[in-house]
Amino acid sequence: TRWAFTDYTQFSPEHQGFSPLPEKRQVLGVATSGELLGLGVWAEYAWNSMERTEDFYGLVVGSNYTFDFQTYVMLEYYRNTLGKTDSDEYTLNDWMRFIASEQKALSRDQVYFLAQHPLTDFIEAGISSIYSISDNSVVIAPTLEYSFAQNMQITAYLNFNIGEEGSVYSDMQGNGGLIRARVYF
């Protein structure tokens, strides 16, 4: 397949924007999922063989469980060797590629946690967090979801960034929130 990063440090009049860096990529992946001791478990691995840039891989290992009292928890580890091992290594290109969704994560190693619990038949509260092992930063996002009809819901969430300046979840980025309405059809 064709893969293209963008060089955000070079402007290209020919492309009327930043310089694209296209190359061929071959991906070999494997995934598995199942149950182990009552826990849902899964793993995914993808090796990316690149034409010019350094090869990299992504690995996800996770587990989930729903307690008898209806609380759902999930824990997932994500490793992406395209990411960096320390926030001092992040470049402008890394940040821009992350923002433009050209790469999935800035940091090499992350842990994701999610917990959800139904408060009523129509309201569910939750909290999720992503911890960057690579730069020791974290984002925490409490959520509240209201399903007022079979195919309609309103979700509100906040996010709190906690980390040193320059880290992927630096508190210098500020905190925020969002209210989203969804209709399924």
Predicted regions and their residues:
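Residues that define the transmembrane beta-barrel architecture of outer-membrane proteins
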Residues: 24-28, 55-59, 107-111, 136-140, ...
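Repeated loop/turn-to-beta-strand initiation elements of outer-membrane beta-barrel proteins
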Residues: 1, 38-42, 70-75, 121-125, ...
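Outer-membrane beta-barrel "beta-signal"
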Residues: 113-117, 146, 153, 157-158, ...
